[in-house]
Amino acid sequence: VQALAQLPELAAPVLALNHIDSPELAGTALFQFGLAPEDEAREVARRAWLEGYTRAAILVPESDWSDRVTAAFTDQWLQLGGYILEQQRYNPAEADHGPAITALLNLDSSQLRKTRLVRQLGRTLEFEPRRRQDIDFIFLLATPEQARLIRPQLKFYRASSVPVLSTSHVYSGQIDSERDSDLDGLQFCDMPWLLDENGNWQHLRNALTARRPAQSVRYARLQALGIDAWRITPYLDQLGGSMFGNYHGSTGNLQVDAAQQVHRTLQWAHF
């Protein structure tokens, strides 16, 4: 995509299946369409705001990818008027996320106060750590495997009543009631291809599943991207114009910005 953007001219409109970091460098004939996780992060921020939340805590893995997605969420959340009370990163290679969670909930501060009191009073105290009570929701970035570890640990550390909102990365793409039982109540956004059983693409999904069942889940989101790309390509000249507006696709409700990047509005579900 970067190479296409650097060309002085394109002979015909081109729909590239990815985004570049500097869309202003692209020519007027280059359109960019990808499954950008940043779009999902902004979607989470908008959803939380519509729910009436104003105070967020962020729990994300240690990675460059996570930093980019978190930045997109943070920018959107602050623009809406929200506050970020705490942000912690966890090691995705570990199973015990207690240190990150206790810091997120200020339980480490509660323990520190207890230690100081014991030192000052010189005697043992009965003590039950108290988490902070001002968090409206937690923005969680995690894979299904990580979320299945983190959600029970949040409950263990007395945060079972705090809503958790996440991106599509928390969902494997297929219902697994047994393995996902600990995720009950967790909200996430994802594409209609996986959530809407009444879409006009359902016959295509059924055909792909019947033909290649092993790949129908693993590559489901890429299949949806290909279908939407095929369907909107004839209308590239109209994309973003007042006559076209948006397109209700299998990857989401599609709109084009001034830099000719296609953005998605997703659907919501919960475990």
Predicted regions, residues:
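Stable alpha-helical elements in mature extracytoplasmic
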Residues: A3-L4, E40-V44, W65, V69-Q76, ...
